[in-house]
Amino acid sequence: MIKKRVIPCLDVKDGRVVKGIQFQSLRDIGNPVDLALYYNEAGADELVFLDISKTEAGHDLMIEVIEATAKQLFIPLTVGGGIQNLDDITQLLNHGADKISLNSSALKHPELIRQASEKFGRQCICIAIDSFYDKDREDYFCTTHGGKKLTDVSVYDWVQEVEHLGAGELLITSMHHDGMKQGFDIEHLAKIKQLVNIPIIASGGGGNAQHFVELFQQTDVSAGLAASILHDQETTVAEIKDKMREGGILVR
């Protein structure tokens, strides 16, 4: 049985870690390098850096932050946000990223997934999906540009397409759960898992350690992402893992 992962997520804007609720009302959390090293020591299985400054305003890729972090990190580092082409991916991997997360650029140019997978290996390519539930259409649709632009692309169709194109992993953020701390979107995640064979990282809604237990007991996703509850020290990676063990879930 595969051990489940707990992954802190650091949203970085203009060189600082920020966090909001449902992608809005961002507040400053701290220095990304310091926080990354803290989570490395605290037992995190991986780290995700999402450069939302790049997504919003076209800021340069945060190479210096990634390089400084990777030099001292002993766990895998995934980097996403504003990655447009193979050159961007090459630069990030060369400066310390272990995996790359593609979102808007993959929706705009799906062939980028295949090209990146063939060049770097599918294990390096994670497709991030900011999933929005449209009440009128009663279905989930992909968004782009940091959740600001709604598309007509069905999440359930897109996850199957990206797996076919060569994605090695999915990062699914349920936007209406993001920052709400009321639990993961279990039904949505379970349905996605039925459609694909690649690992899924669940994001959006983890408000306490028990929510991670419920996530792994009720779905077959591979990992749970956490941000505000860790940044605000409402719980720790160790406490989440202890609760998971109590629930009979294998952890690293």
Swiss-Prot record:
Matches recorded under Gene3D superfamilies: Aldolase class I
MF (Gene Ontology): imidazoleglycerol-phosphate synthase activity; lyase activity
Bridged cysteine pairs (disulfide): none
Name of the protein in question: Imidazole glycerol phosphate synthase subunit HisF
Family per similarity comment: Belongs to the HisA/HisF family.
Species this chain originates from: Staphylococcus epidermidis (strain ATCC 35984 / DSM 28319 / BCRC 17069 / CCUG 31568 / BM 3577 / RP62A)
Assembly, per entry: Heterodimer of HisH and HisF.
Highest classification ranks of the organism: Bacteria, Bacillati, Bacillota, Bacilli, Bacillales
GO biological process terms, semicolon-separated: L-histidine biosynthetic process
Top-level taxon of origin: Bacteria
UniProt GO cellular component terms: cytoplasm
Listed transmembrane segments: none
The keyword Lyase belongs to this UniProt entry's keyword annotation: yes
Cell location: Cytoplasm
Job description of the protein: IGPS catalyzes the conversion of PRFAR and glutamine to IGP, AICAR and glutamate. The HisF subunit catalyzes the cyclization activity that produces IGP and AICAR from PRFAR using the ammonia provided by the HisH subunit.
Location of the active site: D11, D130
Pfam families reported in the protein's UniProt record: His_biosynth
